[in-house]
Amino acid sequence: MVFRFLIISSLIWLSACSNYDPDLVVRLSTKEAKHLFGAIERGSEQRPAPHGSYAKGCVAGADQLAETGPTWQAMRLSRNRNWGHPVAIDFIHDLSAKAERESGWNGLYIGDISQPRGGPMLTGHASHQIGLDIDIWMRPADDLTLSVKKREAISSISMRRANGAYVNEKWSKQHHNIIKAAASDPRTARIFVFPGAKVQMCKDEKGDRAWLNKVRPWWGHHYHFHVRLSCPAGATNCKNQAPPPPGDGCKDAERWVRDILNPPPPNPNAPKRKPKPPLTLALLPQQCVGVLQSN
């Protein structure tokens, strides 16, 4: 509690400075960035801009997704992670409306986007730092009048069985169509979902398969799917992830499934993974100091 008070006090002082304060920046530069960004409760009064990469950056001028809209509800509001670049907020408006219009759901339940100014989070994600990552619950949004309290208690629904090798009986054509709509959007760079879902979509898709390229298998991601948007036009300080390899990616997803069902033996000579050092403010793009300093 004392540490959090000191962090917040430093941030208040930093934001109150009308000019760049190099001494304070030096003192804060060695602090874990998650404590600096995790202590801020609102977005910066700046022109919207993502700075850095999805797992090492921040976002200026983020918008807050309304807690409830005509076709969505933001979940787990206590986390204060319903902030994103305006492109991400517009994407949610569009995709949730399409889900309601074409998939028979009332809309979408939206999980984590970013903190008010992005940056590393106190708990959970390594990415979601520049306001362009969106978690969308697999649970059908059948009730868009959930109270704040209910949204803290309710959980999404897992779609996997056999540790993610296959979808379970709760998987539906609607899930396929909503993920297809998200992947078909030109703003989308990637979608992460558990391997069994990707393989199932590969089997079920009978039409255009180009969108499958953006759907990539990844661990977890069975209670939600994760949409990653490309850097917006003109965002010169934003770093895109390398695009997926050409093709529909179905063979790669099948390899993931084989490895789940028949795990390869561990390599006794594999080097031990060194734990990653925590991200400090000094390791983030220099623009992130200004994002913290802004009103």
Segments the model singles out, each with a brief description of its role:
Residues V2-I8:
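Sec-dependent signal peptide recognition
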Residues S15-A16:
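C-terminal motif of bacterial Sec signal peptides marking the signal peptidase cleavage site
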Residues Y20-H51:
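Solvent-exposed N-terminal domain segments of exported/luminal and surface proteins
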Residues D21-V26, L146, K150-N295:
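Catalytic cores and adjacent binding grooves of peptidoglycan-active enzymes
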Residues A39, F91-T123, F192-K214:
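Extended, low-complexity, intrinsically disordered C-terminal regulatory tails
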Residues R42-G111, W171-K180, D185:
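Active-site acidic/histidine clusters and adjacent loop/turn architecture
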Residues S103-W105, Q129-D133, H222-H224:
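Extracytoplasmic
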Residues T123-A141:
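Short, surface-exposed glycine/acidic/tryptophan-bearing loops
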